[in-house]
């Protein structure tokens, strides 16, 4: 990486402007919210069990970090899979959630439990193919503040995202400027026809 550009040894001479953003960002759910997710997603699975409509908790594949004993077993049996975004945020994969963005998350537990991860150098909208991003390591710098009773005050149950005003330009072009001076050197006042001729 060099600034906002990256290159690859596999494609020499090509630089690519990225839009660095977290694929995953959100607050912790409370136990009631977690139980609601597991219930409604299991109900969806039950409508067509072989279609892969959702993924229930899976104790066999759960990564529980440093948890041990009963706490580990309970979390593995109840923990929501992180693929879908939910009311708390989660795996949102919004490519425009980059420098200058604002996010408003509902908070369900004391301390919010804000977490950020799955950093992408760039991706398409939604990372819909599960491999549509350029993954990266990095640090995230952000300012966090609390809107006291914000969920009740603004009636929100889901995150609100205000995307970054910074978007890379992937078109490669040059611009020819035309001015209001004709071929003989005569000056005109804001003459678009003369300016157009000079640009062409």
Task: Describe each model-derived feature in a short phrase.
Residues 89-90, 100, 117, 124-126:
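Glycine-centered flexibility sites
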Residues 111-121:
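Short, Lys/Arg- and Gly-enriched loop/turn segments at beta-strand edges
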Residues 157-200:
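A hydrophobic, small-residue-rich beta->alpha segment in the mid-to-C-terminal subdomain
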Residues 93-99, 140, 195-200:
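General structural feature for long, well-ordered alpha-helical segments within catalytic domains
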Residues 1-98, 104:
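Intrinsically disordered, low-complexity linker/loop segments enriched in Gly/Pro
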Residues 102, 137-141, 170-171:
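Active-site lining segments that contact anionic ligands and/or coordinate catalytic metals
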